[in-house]
């Protein structure tokens, strides 16, 4: 039975409505899937960025912490060096004061003569040379000549050797030195410095640990003194 035009139109409309509905459902399905994928991708990107931000700030925090440690270490070292400089300045000041006080020794002729006797004898015993040269300040020549005369028999008694001692009148110690003597071998290759300044310097070096301990107390980081 042939369909009338009206029936054909109805079928066409019905088919078109079905197709449109199916298309709409398909579109909704595509939209839903697209939105789901978008949300998943957005979540992934957000998480990735969050991790990057966390990593960045963790790195920054570590850098800041490292900088703080470096700054603290620098400040501690600066403070330690400042204390060491202050201590060294104090020791230098005390040693300079001691050197100034050495000048008072020579103002006591009797005491200074006894000291020269010992310094000359010590120089002879350290050299153990048959001929020695003694140098002193010009103003000490008389005292040193006397010291030499007393030192020779003592030297001979101790060393069982003879010695010829020449007090140098050509080359002398500077007049502004504190005092004492320098004792040379005859070829002047060996010298014993027994000036008051050199004796003070030697003594201060030998006694520096005790000096530091007396001034600043025992060093907690040092178990023994060298």
Curated annotation (Swiss-Prot):
* A GO molecular-function descriptor: proton-transporting ATPase activity, rotational mechanism
Check the record and name the InterPro entries matching this protein.
ATPase_E_C, ATPase_V1_Esu
List the keywords (alphabetical): Hydrogen ion transport, Ion transport, Transport
Q: List, alphabetically, the GO terms of the cellular component aspect.
A: acrosomal vesicle; proton-transporting two-sector ATPase complex, catalytic domain
Q: Which domain of life is it from?
A: Eukaryota
Enumerate the HAMAP family for this protein. Answer: ATP_synth_E_arch
What's the stated role of this polypeptide?
Subunit of the V1 complex of vacuolar(H+)-ATPase (V-ATPase), a multisubunit enzyme composed of a peripheral complex (V1) that hydrolyzes ATP and a membrane integral complex (V0) that translocates protons. V-ATPase is responsible for acidifying and maintaining the pH of intracellular compartments and in some cell types, is targeted to the plasma membrane, where it is responsible for acidifying the extracellular environment.
Which PANTHER family has this protein been placed in?
ATPASE H+-TRANSPORTING V1 SUBUNIT E1A-RELATED
Tell me which family the UniProt entry assigns to this protein.
Belongs to the V-ATPase E subunit family.
Q: How does it assemble?
A: V-ATPase is a heteromultimeric enzyme made up of two complexes: the ATP-hydrolytic V1 complex and the proton translocation V0 complex. The V1 complex consists of three catalytic AB heterodimers that form a heterohexamer, three peripheral stalks each consisting of EG heterodimers, one central rotor including subunits D and F, and the regulatory subunits C and H. The proton translocation complex V0 consists of the proton transport subunit a, a ring of proteolipid subunits c9c'', rotary subunit d, subunits e and f, and the accessory subunits ATP6AP1/Ac45 and ATP6AP2/PRR.
UniProt protein name: V-type proton ATPase subunit E 2
């Amino acid at each position: 039975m042939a369909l009338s035009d009206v029936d054909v139109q109805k079928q066409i409309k019905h088919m078109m409505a079905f197709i449109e509905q199916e298309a709409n459902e398909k579109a909704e399905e595509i939209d839903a899937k697209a939105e789901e994928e978008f949300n998943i991708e957005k979540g992934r990107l957000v998480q990735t960025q969050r991790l990057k931000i966390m990593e960045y700030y963790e790195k920054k925090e570590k850098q800041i912490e490292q900088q703080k440690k470096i700054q603290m270490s620098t400040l501690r070292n600066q403070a330690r060096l400042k204390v060491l400089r202050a201590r060294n300045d104090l020791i230098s000041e005390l040693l300079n004061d001691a050197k100034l006080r050495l000048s008072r020794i020579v103002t006591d002729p009797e005491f200074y003569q006894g000291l020269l006797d010992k310094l000359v004898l010590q120089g002879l015993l350290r050299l153990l040379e048959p001929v020695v040269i003694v140098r002193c300040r010009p103003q000490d020549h008389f005292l040193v000549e006397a010291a030499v005369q007393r030192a020779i028999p003592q030297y001979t008694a101790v060393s069982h050797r003879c010695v010829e001692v020449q007090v140098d009148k050509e080359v002398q110690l500077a007049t502004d030195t504190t005092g004492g003597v320098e004792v040379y071998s005859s070829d002047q290759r060996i010298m014993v410095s027994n000036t008051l300044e050199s004796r003070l310097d030697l003594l201060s070096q030998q006694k520096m640990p005790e000096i530091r301990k007396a001034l600043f107390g025992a060093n907690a980081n040092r178990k023994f003194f060298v």
